[in-house]
């Protein structure tokens, strides 16, 4: 590719006076790259968008390169003013494609929401029809659960659609920025043409030709990967290519600045520099005309010296090679330039070849007459261009950083999807196990039903009345069982359908992969055939060159023989003259001598004639060989032309086949997109299935509880039957005894009456004494409570006053030390005070301290990973008044714990259940009372476990109630402190999974709060935290943090005593980073950044900075 471009470059560089060099040198770039924007408007999801991006621009290309190539095509077809119009049209096309993509995403979001609402309404009508029977309560629960699950699935779908829309918006923004960069490049190109800097344009042609060759090779292999992982990998590679292109643009900008500085055109002296370049541009044709050298070396020297004096630049070498004509000439001229010319004035005054000094001296005088409005315009345009280029680079960095963060989150979402698929399979297995257990429970229910029928028959035999609630409940349970058998059958049918769809999709995907592999094989065979044709053409060229060399040799031999023949003819003429002279002498002189001479001459003549005849034969033979070689050459030329036409036809056929393969690949991509949409629908169905499964689990637990209740009722019935039998026997014995004692009852009635009156008086006296004692004890209890509260309050007040005094003294000492030193580290006395305060805020323990540490004091000693319900800030960031309020709330919670220490046992609550026995305790044996009390205590334990949340709410609501209600509720809340300590007591599975997710990734809650990606959510949190701070503008995680002020501002919101923010400046980077890292390490945040790297790099690694900021957020906010 380089060989094909260099002649055009050399021809363009020869016309130095024409300003169209920068526009014509880009003709070597390919035109086909502009078609890569077409697949971007046809995608349907984020994965298809990524695949289209990867397919259109596989490895080392980016959006900037695309726009650069389209602009180069536009510039070849028009003059220098046309790139602006072409860039405007491309920007309009790109913005229209972006608006089309956003409209597509909005329509897709509306259709998905409408379908979800339709599903909800259909489910609501079905539930309403089914709720007309006896299952109203269970159907209401099903409806609420289904609504929650569908709302959750709709939220996930909307989150995915929002992410896709956000990615598309970011890509549209990147495209618009690329269009602006293209516009700026066109203006830069115009400025280069005006300034005479065309070397850079000459280099871009062969470099981008090589890039296209490298891009077309992995183009086919990049499309072969059809899954999401390969797409993400390709997008990461593309992002890396974007980074490389940005680095290339930076180096280009830096090199242009260096070249301007080397030429003497600094940013403050642009006017003079541009005037001097214009003077040189007007002078260079005269110098070229005045030079007397034939090789053009002087012109190459001046061009290389003006166009780029920076050592080692490729533009200088290329320009020297074009103007000089050889590598030796290039080296000599470049060395001449670097030794002789050091500034723009020297370049203007330096002689070129044989040009005289008068011409170089009259050039500045000509240029001074041309200074005017062009200098001001060039100065303003260059300043605007540099500012806009800096702004575009910053925006490009932020966009690339956000794209990388979005890619990482997409990879995380893919991993979560895989985990959910595995969990779905596990839930399917668990569903089978639960169905088996449900069948076993139904068998047990049938067995218990038979036992209840037997017990009813026994009750009917003894004529005991009973309530028919069991029949109603059993009918309801049978109805529930039938319903869940139907649900299980429907779930099994849906699973079979899903398996069939999955099998169909996998078969389709395999067929698509096979077709793709066949297409790859065909393309490889065509490429191999093409290479073979090229090798044959090369061998034919070599044979033709050999034939031409032989022909040249024969021509040289013929020319030498013709020269020899002419020499022999001249010699023959001389001999004939000599013979004529000898004949004349023969006639005049002696004949013998003459005869001898004639004989010698005759022999010489014969030899000369023989030699001439031989030479004539050789000449004829050479002419015949020459004719034969010409015929052979013409034949080979015809064969070569026929072969070239055949090769061109085969290449056109191969191109048509390749285009057909590309169309097939696009069809496969659309099929893959449809498959991905079906996969999304299947994931929605999986979410619904999971919600139904959760509801089934809840109903199964209800069924198990109902079975336990039935067992308890069975035991109650058996116990009541035994008690009734016993009462019947006792009443019969009492009746007989009453009949026997009826006669003596009248005699002793008066005695019994008098004794009863005495006992009544004794009981009244005891009752009065017990009431007085109770009042006295209640007063003592109130006095003890008030005394303890006063003592604790006084102790806390004294301790807080001492802490405030110590902190005031420490602040004064730290203020003095801060003025004298540059870095402020926390003194060890503050740490010891904080530790002592934390230890003192938890003690001293009271009599009931065995219960309260698990309730109130547990959240205080926190770790960075454990989410605490009460977010207590660290001790260094809490004021003394806040500490006093925290300690006051803790001391107010202690009397409740002291009351909880006097709770009765479980059997104290079971006394009201004795009314079921319909008799007095005096007529029953103690064993029956013991059994009944044990049974009721087990009931209260189970009820207390089920109603843990209600008891907690009652406990919190009844703090101001009477002590009797607290005593009554403490028995039920005592086991709650044990059960609520486990995470499965009062936490639903969704909240439990959310807690696990927050422990693994603390940014998930932040992303839910602010919306969007985790990177943007953390960025918004940082911006919210640093509101009101001066000299801080956080737009990314790289350049916004390079001076350390952002770290200091974020940490100053939590640790104001550690960071004197008003004294900090952006110039003292090392001090800022040192203060921030030491403040974070003082509270336990480990530093993961290197101070030297942060100080010396303009753009630190955004991932490491984001990790450190995440650690800060995790410590202070979770």
Curated annotation (Swiss-Prot):
<feature type="compositionally biased region" description="Low complexity">
    <location>
        <begin position="343"/>
        <end position="363"/>
    </location>
</feature>
<keyword id="KW-0206">Cytoskeleton</keyword>
<feature type="region of interest" description="Disordered">
    <location>
        <begin position="771"/>
        <end position="790"/>
    </location>
</feature>
<feature type="compositionally biased region" description="Basic and acidic residues">
    <location>
        <begin position="946"/>
        <end position="956"/>
    </location>
</feature>
<dbReference type="GO" id="GO:0005819">
    <property type="term" value="C:spindle"/>
</dbReference>
<dbReference type="Pfam" id="PF00307">
    <property type="entry name" value="CH"/>
</dbReference>
<dbReference type="GO" id="GO:0005737">
    <property type="term" value="C:cytoplasm"/>
</dbReference>
<feature type="coiled-coil region">
    <location>
        <begin position="225"/>
        <end position="264"/>
    </location>
</feature>
<feature type="compositionally biased region" description="Pro residues">
    <location>
        <begin position="861"/>
        <end position="872"/>
    </location>
</feature>
<comment type="subunit">
    <text>May interact with both microtubules and actin cytoskeleton.</text>
</comment>
<keyword id="KW-0963">Cytoplasm</keyword>
<dbReference type="InterPro" id="IPR036872">
    <property type="entry name" value="CH_dom_sf"/>
</dbReference>
<dbReference type="GO" id="GO:0005921">
    <property type="term" value="C:gap junction"/>
</dbReference>
<feature type="region of interest" description="Disordered">
    <location>
        <begin position="1"/>
        <end position="157"/>
    </location>
</feature>
<keyword id="KW-0131">Cell cycle</keyword>
<keyword id="KW-0132">Cell division</keyword>
<dbReference type="InterPro" id="IPR050540">
    <property type="entry name" value="F-actin_Monoox_Mical"/>
</dbReference>
<protein>
    <recommendedName>
        <fullName>Cytospin-A</fullName>
    </recommendedName>
</protein>
<feature type="compositionally biased region" description="Acidic residues">
    <location>
        <begin position="204"/>
        <end position="215"/>
    </location>
</feature>
<feature type="compositionally biased region" description="Polar residues">
    <location>
        <begin position="930"/>
        <end position="945"/>
    </location>
</feature>
<feature type="region of interest" description="Disordered">
    <location>
        <begin position="198"/>
        <end position="221"/>
    </location>
</feature>
<feature type="compositionally biased region" description="Polar residues">
    <location>
        <begin position="112"/>
        <end position="123"/>
    </location>
</feature>
<feature type="compositionally biased region" description="Polar residues">
    <location>
        <begin position="838"/>
        <end position="855"/>
    </location>
</feature>
<comment type="similarity">
    <text>Belongs to the cytospin-A family.</text>
</comment>
<feature type="region of interest" description="Disordered">
    <location>
        <begin position="920"/>
        <end position="1001"/>
    </location>
</feature>
<feature type="region of interest" description="Disordered">
    <location>
        <begin position="289"/>
        <end position="379"/>
    </location>
</feature>
<feature type="coiled-coil region">
    <location>
        <begin position="475"/>
        <end position="796"/>
    </location>
</feature>
<feature type="domain" description="Calponin-homology (CH)">
    <location>
        <begin position="1012"/>
        <end position="1117"/>
    </location>
</feature>
<keyword id="KW-0303">Gap junction</keyword>
<comment type="function">
    <text>Involved in cytokinesis and spindle organization. May play a role in actin cytoskeleton organization and microtubule stabilization and hence required for proper cell adhesion and migration.</text>
</comment>
<feature type="compositionally biased region" description="Polar residues">
    <location>
        <begin position="57"/>
        <end position="102"/>
    </location>
</feature>
<feature type="compositionally biased region" description="Low complexity">
    <location>
        <begin position="961"/>
        <end position="986"/>
    </location>
</feature>
<keyword id="KW-0965">Cell junction</keyword>
<feature type="region of interest" description="Disordered">
    <location>
        <begin position="837"/>
        <end position="876"/>
    </location>
</feature>
<dbReference type="InterPro" id="IPR001715">
    <property type="entry name" value="CH_dom"/>
</dbReference>
<feature type="compositionally biased region" description="Basic and acidic residues">
    <location>
        <begin position="144"/>
        <end position="153"/>
    </location>
</feature>
<dbReference type="GO" id="GO:0051301">
    <property type="term" value="P:cell division"/>
</dbReference>
<feature type="coiled-coil region">
    <location>
        <begin position="384"/>
        <end position="438"/>
    </location>
</feature>
<keyword id="KW-0175">Coiled coil</keyword>
């Amino acid at each position: 590719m380089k060989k094909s471009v260099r002649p055009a470059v050399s021809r363009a560089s020869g016309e130095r006076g024409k300003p169209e060099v920068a526009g014509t040198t880009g003709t070597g770039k390919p035109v086909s790259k502009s078609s890569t924007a077409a697949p971007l408007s046809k995608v349907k999801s984020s994965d298809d968008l990524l695949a289209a991006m990867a397919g259109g621009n596989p490895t080392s290309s980016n959006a900037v390169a695309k726009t650069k190539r389209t602009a180069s095509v536009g510039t070849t077809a028009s003059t220098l003013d046309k790139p602006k119009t072409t860039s405007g049209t491309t920007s309009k096309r790109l913005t229209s494609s972006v608006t089309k993509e956003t409209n597509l995403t909005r329509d897709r979001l509306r259709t998905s929401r409408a379908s979800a609402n339709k599903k909800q309404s259909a489910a609501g009508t079905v539930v309403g029809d089914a709720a007309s029977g006896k299952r109203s309560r269970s159907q209401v629960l099903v409806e609420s659960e289904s609504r929650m699950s569908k709302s959750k699935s709709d939220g996930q779908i909307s989150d995915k659609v929002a992410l896709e829309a956000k990615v598309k918006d970011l890509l549209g923004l990147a495209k618009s920025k690329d269009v602006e960069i293209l516009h700026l490049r066109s203006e830069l190109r115009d400025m280069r043409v005006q300034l005479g800097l065309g070397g850079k344009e000459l280099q871009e042609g062969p470099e981008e030709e090589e890039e296209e060759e490298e891009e077309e090779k992995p183009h086919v292999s990049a499309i072969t990967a059809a899954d999401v992982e390969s797409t993400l990998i390709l997008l990461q590679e593309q992002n890396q290519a974007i980074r490389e292109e940005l680095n290339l643009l930076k180096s280009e900008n830096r090199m242009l600045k260096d070249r301007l500085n080397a030429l003497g055109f600094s940013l403050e002296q642009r006017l003079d520099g541009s005037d001097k370049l214009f003077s040189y541009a007007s002078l260079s044709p005269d110098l070229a005309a005045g030079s007397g050298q034939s090789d053009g070396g002087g012109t190459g020297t001046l061009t290389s010296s003006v166009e780029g004096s920076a050592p080692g630049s490729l533009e200088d070498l290329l320009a020297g090679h074009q103007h000089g004509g050889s590598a030796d000439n290039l080296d000599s001229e470049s060395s001449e330039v670097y030794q002789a010319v050091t500034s723009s004035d020297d370049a203007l005054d330096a002689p070129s070849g044989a040009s005289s000094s008068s011409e170089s001296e009259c050039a500045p005088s000509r240029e001074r007459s041309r200074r005017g409005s062009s200098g001001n315009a060039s100065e303003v345009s260059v300043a605007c261009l540099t500012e806009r280029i800096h702004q575009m680079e910053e925006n490009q960095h932020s966009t690339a950083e956000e794209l990388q963060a979005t890619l990482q989150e997409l990879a995380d979402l893919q991993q979560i999807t895989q985990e959910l698929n595995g969990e779905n399979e596990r839930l399917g297995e668990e569903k089978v196990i639960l169905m088996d257990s449900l069948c076993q429970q139904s068998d047990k229910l049938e067995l218990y039903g038979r036992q209840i029928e037997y017990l009813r028959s026994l009750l009917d035999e003894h004529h005991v009345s009973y309530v028919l609630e069991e029949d109603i409940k059993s009918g309801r349970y049978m109805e529930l069982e039938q319903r869940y058998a139907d649900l299980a059958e429907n779930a099994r049918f849906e699973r079979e359908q899903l398996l069939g769809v999955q099998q169909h999709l996998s078969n389709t995907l395999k067929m698509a992969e096979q077709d793709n592999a066949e297409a790859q094989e065909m393309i490889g065979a065509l490429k191999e055939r093409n290479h073979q044709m090229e090798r044959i053409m090369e061998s034919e060229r070599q044979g033709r060159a050999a034939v031409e060399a032989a022909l040249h040799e024969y021509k040289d031999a013929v020319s030498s023989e013709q020269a020899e023949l002419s020499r022999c003819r001249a010699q023959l003429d001389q001999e004939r003259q000599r013979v004529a002279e000898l004949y004349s002498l023969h006639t005049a002189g002696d004949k013998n001598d003459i005869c001898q001479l004639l004989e010698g001459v005759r022999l010489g003549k014969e030899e000369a004639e023989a030699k001439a005849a031989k030479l004539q034969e050789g000449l004829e033979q050479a002419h015949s060989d020459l004719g034969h070689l010409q015929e052979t050459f013409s034949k080979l030329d015809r064969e070569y032309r026929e072969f070239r036409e055949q090769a061109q036809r085969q290449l056109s056929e191969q191109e048509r086949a390749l285009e057909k393969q590309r169309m097939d690949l696009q069809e496969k991509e659309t099929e893959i997109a449809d498959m991905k949409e079906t996969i999304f629908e299947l994931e929605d169905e999986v979410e619904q299935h999971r919600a139904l499964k959760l509801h089934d689990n809840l109903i199964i637990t209800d069924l198990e509880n109902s079975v336990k209740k039935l067992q308890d009722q069975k035991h109650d019935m058996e116990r009541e039957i035994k008690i009734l039998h016993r009462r019947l026997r006792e009443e019969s014995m009492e009746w007989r005894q009453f009949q026997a004692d009826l006669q003596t009852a009248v005699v002793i009635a008066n005695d019994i009456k008098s004794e009863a009156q005495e006992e009544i008086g004794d009981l009244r006296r005891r009752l009065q004494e017990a009431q007085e004692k109770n009042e006295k004890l209640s007063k003592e209890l109130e006095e003890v409570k008030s005394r303890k509260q006063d003592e604790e309050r006084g102790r806390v007040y004294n301790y807080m006053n001492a802490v405030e005094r110590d902190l005031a003294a420490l602040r004064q000492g730290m203020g003095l030390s801060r003025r004298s030193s540059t870095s402020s580290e926390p003194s060890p006395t503050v740490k010891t005070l904080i530790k002592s305060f934390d230890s003192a805020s938890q003690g001293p323990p009271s009599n009931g301290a065995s219960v309260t540490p698990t309730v109130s004091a547990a959240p205080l000693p926190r770790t960075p990973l454990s989410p605490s319900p009460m977010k207590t800030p660290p001790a260094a960031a809490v004021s003394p008044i806040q500490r006093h309020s925290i300690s006051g709330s803790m001391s107010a919670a202690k009397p409740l714990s002291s009351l909880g220490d006097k709770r009765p046992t479980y059997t104290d609550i079971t006394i009201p259940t004795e009314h079921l026995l319909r008799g007095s305790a005096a007529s029953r044996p103690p064993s029956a009372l013991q059994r009944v009390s044990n049974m009721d205590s087990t009931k209260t334990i189970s009820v207390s476990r089920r109603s843990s949340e209600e008891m907690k709410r009652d406990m919190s609501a009844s703090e101001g109630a009477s002590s009797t209600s607290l005593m009554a509720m403490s028995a039920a809340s005592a086991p709650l402190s044990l059960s609520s300590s486990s995470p499965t007591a009062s936490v639903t599975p969704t909240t439990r999974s959310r807690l696990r997710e927050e422990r693994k990734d603390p940014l998930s809650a932040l992303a839910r709060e602010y919306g969007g990606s985790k990177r943007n959510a953390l960025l918004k949190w940082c911006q919210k935290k640093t509101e009101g701070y001066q000299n801080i503008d956080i737009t990314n995680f790289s350049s916004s943090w390079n001076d350390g002020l952002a770290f200091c501002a974020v940490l100053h919101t939590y640790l104001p005593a550690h960071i004197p923010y008003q004294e900090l400046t952006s110039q003292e980077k090392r001090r800022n980073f040192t203060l921030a890292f030491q403040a974070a390490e003082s509270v336990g945040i480990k530093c993961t950044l290197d101070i030297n790297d942060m100080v010396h790099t303009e753009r630190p690694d955004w991932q490491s900075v984001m990790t450190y900021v995440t650690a800060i957020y995790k410590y202070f906010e979770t």
